[in-house]
Swiss-Prot record:
NCBIfam families: dnaG (TIGR01391)
Domain Toprim: 259-340
Biological function: RNA polymerase that catalyzes the synthesis of short RNA molecules used as primers for DNA polymerase during DNA replication.
A Pfam short name: Zn_ribbon_DnaG
ZnF start-end (CHC2-type): 37-61
Positions contributing to Mg(2+) 1 binding: 265, 309
Similarity field: Belongs to the DnaG primase family.
Stored SUPFAM superfamilies: DNA primase core, Zinc beta-ribbon
Record-listed Mg(2+) 2 binding positions: 309, 311
Name assigned to this protein: DNA primase
GO BP term, pick one: DNA replication, synthesis of primer
Keywords: DNA replication, DNA-binding, DNA-directed RNA polymerase, Magnesium, Metal-binding, Nucleotidyltransferase, Primosome, Transcription, Transferase, Zinc, Zinc-finger
Cofactor requirements of the protein: Zn(2+); Mg(2+)
């Protein structure tokens, strides 16, 4: 009881507004304060802080709580760590607080997180050493991709040989240093089917950091052409792909000062921009750009510049990412890349100033897509013309700003030579259909013949397509719960480069992922 009273007293005398304002801008609104929610992307403030009652609440994402809960969510820390921060600011000695038994599970989780951080930190210096001794890996980064040594050091790139140290493999070496089998299993470094084999062996390694600089995971690139080109660790206690962007920590100061982020396709592209002196490039971790990524960016920037590869996959990624951004009225532009090239190619062939030049010539995302798709479609064919009209009217419908919609309609009208009045008729038809589709969304989730089941069947027939699909879809995009679980299983198989039979897969889906028998019978 004394512990609870102490915590309550501490919270009551601490200004929650002062804490929240360290993360977002607040403005007075009656007796409360409001601002843009830091936990989801939005363009109109729905996040409120009540200083009298000491709580926050967002009417958009429904997240709320007290000052400790806010710190836990913002810093991705547990209850006790948030409490420590408040103790420091309140002049209370944390050690004097008697933590109740109810916090034991939290402490266990904190202990595991601490051990994973320790393990990852220990690994950093070792993989950096092995990279310095591996000519092939060094030549790939420094010569083939023209990344500067300064940037290699900044991002702490590494390499992991098969024979780790003194004839020991990595697993046995770490055990000899006191790490338990449970910690090694939960670190994500090792194969689930062969727990002593690291999924990163003989790969160029990219340490991935959270916004506080903790190494939370790793990505790896194959240099021999023997496995998946890129892999990332699976999800762990500290490694949440939807909450992370590669390069965000290293580029944080420039992102804050310019209020701008360059979104690229992969790790090497991030390094290419940094080598050019442009230190605000980020990439997702092998998954599609999501609303969670956008929410992270919008805390610190009001502009996103897409710089994806100049191929069909890059165009598809640009379109999907733009569809996510449009409802939130963030300024989006696109860097034009020649077909088949990426930022690292431009850096190597044209020098360190080349990326700044193409960045200066970026164009509005809507205009870029309009130009590209008008060349991609044969507008003399009715079917192609209708497809383009539908594509762009659906895009326009995503915008929440009426003036922006009018500008987009004018641009589409000028490009196609079709009057705005005519386009508006189709637009309102699409808008009505969109409302109907939304109302039926839950019904479709239980429709056995939904497109999601067909997607799963197609991937089962040719799993190699998954490397393309995963760049444009993440599991949360799927409506059907069972389809989502299957997709998560596929992600795990892909990350571990594992072969499988249909019989083994079905057993795994049933026993591990709890996919329903009814769904499994469909394939």
């Amino acid at each position: 009881m004394k512990y609870l009273q102490t915590v309550a007293s501490m919270k009551s005398k601490f200004d929650i507004v002062a804490i929240v304002e360290q993360y977002i801008k607040l403005v007075k609104s009656g007796s409360a304060y409001k601002g843009l929610c830091p936990f989801h992307a939005e363009k109109t403030p729905s996040f409120f802080v009540n200083p009298l009652q000491g709580y926050f609440y967002c009417f958009g994402c429904k997240k709320g709580g007290d000052v400790i809960g806010f710190l836990m969510d913002m810093e991705k820390i547990n209850y006790n760590d948030a409490l420590k921060i408040l103790c420091e600011k309140s002049g209370i000695h944390y050690d004097d607080l008697k933590i109740s038994r109810g916090s034991e599970n939290k402490n266990e989780n904190k202990d595991m997180v601490s051990k994973i951080y320790s393990l990852n930190s220990r690994l950093i210096n070792t993989i950096k050493f092995f990279l310095s001794k591996n000519k092939k890996a060094l030549d790939y980064v420094l010569k083939s991709r023209a990344i500067s040594k300064e940037i290699v050091d900044l991002f702490e790139l590494g390499y992991l040989p098969f024979n780790f140290k003194n004839g020991l493999e990595l697993h046995d070496f770490l055990v000899s240093k006191g790490y338990s089998s449970e910690v090694l299993r939960k670190s994500g470094l090792f194969s689930k089917t062969n727990p002593k084999v690291s999924i990163l062996f003989q790969r160029l390694i990219f340490p991935i950091k959270d916004f506080k600089g903790n190494v939370v995971g790793f990505g790896g690139r194959d240099l021999d052409g023997k496995g998946s080109k890129y892999i990332n660790l699976g999800e762990t206690e500290v490694f949440k792909k939807r909450e992370l962007l590669y390069g965000f920590y290293e580029g944080f100061e420039e992102i804050k000062s310019t209020k701008s982020v360059i979104l690229v396709e992969g790790y090497i592209d991030v390094l290419a921009f940094f080598t050019s002196g442009i230190k605000r490039a980020v990439s997702t971790l092998g998954t599609a750009f999501s609303k969670e990524h956008l929410a992270l960016i919008q805390r610190y920037a009001d502009e996103i510049i897409f710089s994806f590869d100049g191929d069909d996959a890059g165009l598809s990624a640009t379109l999907k990412a733009y569809q996510i951004c449009l409802p939130f009225n963030i300024n989006v532009s696109v860097v034009r890349m020649d077909f088949g090239t990426d930022p690292a190619d431009v850096l190597k062939s044209e020098g360190v100033d080349s990326l700044q030049k193409i960045l200066n010539n970026r164009c509005d995302a809507f205009e870029y897509l309009l130009d590209v798709y008008s060349n991609k479609y044969n507008l003399n064919k009715t079917v192609d013309l209708n497809a383009m009209i539908n594509l762009f009217l659906n895009l326009i419908n995503l915008s929440k700003v009426d003036t922006q919609k009018k500008i987009f309609l004018d641009k589409l009208s000028n490009k196609l030579g079709i009057g705005v009045t005519t386009l508006l008729k189709d637009y309102y038809r699409i808008k009505e259909r969109f409302v109907v589709d939304n109302n039926k969304r839950n019904l479709y989730a239980h429709n056995d013949d939904s497109y999601e089941r067909y997607l799963i069947v197609a991937l089962l027939k040719n799993f190699s397509y998954f490397s393309i699909v995963r760049r444009n879809i993440i599991d949360s995009d799927l409506i059907n719960v069972d389809a989502r679980k299957v997709f998560m299983c596929f992600e795990n198989l892909f990350e571990n480069n594992k072969d499988f039979s249909l019989m083994d897969l079905k057993k795994n889906l049933k026993d591990t992922y709890k996919v329903s028998e009814f769904f499994l019978k469909k394939f």
